[in-house]
Amino acid sequence: MLSIDHVDWLELIRVTLHPLAKFPGPKLAGASYCYEFWYEVICGIQYTQKIIKLHEQYGPIVRINPDELHFNDVDFVDVVYTAGARKRDKSSHYLAGFGGVSKSTFGTLDHMHHRTRRRALNKFFSKSRVLQIEDSIHEKSQQLCDKFLAYRDQGPFDLTGAFSCIATDTVTEYCFGSSPGFLNQDGWEPNCKSYFETIERMAHVTRHVPWILYLAKWLPLSIIRLVSSDLNSFLVDTRVKKPERLKRVVLDAERHDAKDCPVFLELLNSDLPPREKSKQRFMYEANGATLAGSGSTAIAMSNIVYNLVANPRIGHKLRSELLGKVSDPKNLPRWSSLEELPYLTAVIHEGLRSMYDPSKERLPYDPSQERLPRIATEEELIYKDGSTPGKSKYVIPRGYAIGTSAHVVHSDESIFPNASQFNPERWLGRDGQRNRELERHLLSFSKGSRYCLGMHCRCTTCLALPASVRNGTRGY
């Protein structure tokens, strides 16, 4: 009885005296995490869709759980997702679903700690550094096209799984100096698509029931295999394969010159503090890089190719533009030339914008399109709402999470009219060139000091693949 009374008092305080109690939103969402749990776990990852409806009901800023706000105002994006000296921590509730990912750069809670880890990685994923592996990306793109041709008469296959093969091979080879060789195998299985999706879906459960992660950590693989083959594959990769690759990187160090040195070998030789170079931390860093570098890239490319086939007019227009630039699929132009093609760039942007499928029927689940909360630790944020009479200003107290979702912004009809339609022309100005103003609202890579580290690598792959698929297979 005492514990029940305690819960009742806690919920009452949350909706009356809590610093976020003044913000609009369902009282149940403010009182308890059960509201979020219902839509995330029981309803099957549907909270983002529910949040869209909450904004329609309550306005551009909504309290979505006891300690977190969600906003839907593009003018406020650069305030929350800021760069420079303004500190932004991540939310411990958000990161709880990822377990040991806190040891990776992506999962680092504290702003300054993140800066230390991020600084060590930035140079490896800069545009100039990614250009050094552009030839490798082009070779793998052509290899993928050759494989498409070889398997074209052998029935349907999972397109996202196929793109997962090239994405995983690319990022793993760059980080470790060797890859799983998914493109070299017969067929498209195995690949990382299935177990990555399982892990990402599990995060919504373990965020509320974290002890599941600790149980999975200590259970033997023989038992895990009986529960979930995908989870078993992920743990085998984490516990066995990645440690073997890292060990091989160290043992074969003398075979790599400075230019071709794998990322993790350079990190081992960097000026990071010794505690940041532990094998366990590098395993989590590797998991983060592989998950981010392959899953989202595969989904984006699958979405783009699907829409090019489903919309012959768009495919024909892109094909016409590529004919003037790409004469030989085995000798693709450089990134700098491909990104000058306005319609190709527009197709890529539209593919990134529309890569979230709420039904999960056409495209796999992609967590990068959902909310990414931030916490301002040293300042109060001022939000001015001109759409709600009498409530034109909110003061968001320091220490509480606030964020938005890429999918929510990308579905905003005031920014992207007919948002449910795949329409690359929206990214072009009247002169047929890139609409730079609209590109400011693309949040597929997040923004600010914690924007996606692999952005340039993904962009290079996304630019190369449509050109290769079009010329190498005479596709779309």
From Swiss-Prot:
- Domain of life per record: Eukaryota
- Alphabetic keyword roster: Heme, Iron, Metal-binding, Monooxygenase, Oxidoreductase
Q: One GO molecular-function annotation for this sequence?
A: monooxygenase activity
Class of the enzyme per the UniProt entry, highest EC level: oxidoreductase
The cysteines joined by S-S bonds are none
Which co-factor is required? heme
* Pfam families xref list: p450 (PF00067)
Q: Which InterPro entries match?
A: Cyt_P450 (IPR001128), Cyt_P450_CS (IPR017972), Cyt_P450_E_grp-IV (IPR002403), Cyt_P450_sf (IPR036396), Cytochrome_P450_monoxygenase (IPR050121)
EC no. given is: 1.-.-.-
Question: What positions does the entry give for heme binding?
Answer: C452
Give, as in the UniProt entry, the pathway in which the protein acts: Secondary metabolite biosynthesis
Q: Give the record's family classification.
A: Belongs to the cytochrome P450 family.
Q: What does this gene product do?
A: Cytochrome P450 monooxygenase; part of the gene cluster that mediates the biosynthesis of pyrrolopyrazines, secondary metabolites showing insecticidal activity. The role of ppzE within the pathway has still to be determined. The single multifunctional NRPS ppzA is sufficient to produce peramine via condensation of 1-pyrroline-5-carboxylate and arginine, N-methylation of the alpha-amino group of arginine and reduction of the thioester and the cyclization to form an iminium ion resulting in release from the peptide synthetase.
Its recorded name reads Cytochrome P450 monooxygenase ppzE
Q: Give the source species.
A: Metarhizium majus (strain ARSEF 297)
- UniProt lineage: Eukaryota, Fungi, Dikarya, Ascomycota, Pezizomycotina
